[in-house]
C-alpha cells in the first residue's frame, strides 16, 4: 500500500497537542482518518483540544508526558503502545522558545532549551524507532523553524536548538532510510501559536542589546498581524506523511516559505 492510501488504523502521535500547531495538526489528521494520540503535559489542561474534537465529531486520544523527562517519555509512549499496538507516524511538535543574545545567554539557559527542543524530540524518536525499524515502515516529522535555517535576532538559545534538530534530522534520515522509515523536517515561519505569547522575556543584562531586542519584538508584532493559520502547517505535515515523492525539508508559513 502506498503512503497516500491511508488506513483508518494508521496511528499518529502528535507531541504538544494542546495548542497551536500541535492542536491543529492533531485535529487535521483525525479528520483525515488517522488514529491520533496527542501528548500533553497535563490532561487537565487539554479542554480546548477535546472540546474542538467533540464539536467536529472527531476522536483524539490523549497521553500525558513531558518531553523534558526521559522517564516521562518512556512511560507515555509505553501507554500509547499498550493502547494503539503500534505507532506509524511521530510528529515531534512540542517545544519552547528562547530569547537572548549570545553574550548574555548562560550555558544553563542553552541547555534548558536544548533539553526540550532537541533532546525532547530525540527521546520521542528513540521511543518509536525500534517498532518502526521492525515493521520497516513509519514516518518521523520533526518541527523545527525558519530559525533552524536562518539566525534570528536575539534568539540564540532557540536558534541553537533548532539548528541542532535540523542536523540530527538529516543524520537520522541517512540512518533509517534503509529500514523504510521516512524523516521529514517541517520549518514553520510565524504561525498562529501560543508560543509567541509565552516567549516575551527579553534578557538585556548589559544594556547593549536593547535595539536588537526591540527589532525582535517588532518582528513578533508583524508576525502576529500576518501569522499563518496553524492548520496550514498541519496540511504540510500530512502531505509529508502521505506523499509518494518525499522531500527532506518543507518550509511553510509567513516568513518561512
Q: Residue locations for each model-derived region?
A:
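Conserved glycine-rich cofactor-binding loop
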Residues: 18-19
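Conserved glycine-rich Rossmann-like NAD(P)H-binding loop of the short-chain dehydrogenase/reductase
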Residues: 32-48
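The beta1-alpha1 cofactor-binding region of Rossmann-like NAD(H)/NADP(H)-dependent oxidoreductases
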Residues: 65-75, 107
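Substrate-binding pocket helix/loop in short-chain dehydrogenase/reductase
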Residues: 101-102, 109-111
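Active-site helix of classical SDR
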Residues: 125, 161
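Residue(s) in the substrate-gating loop at a strand-loop-helix junction
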Residues: 145
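SDR active-site lid
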Residues: 177-248
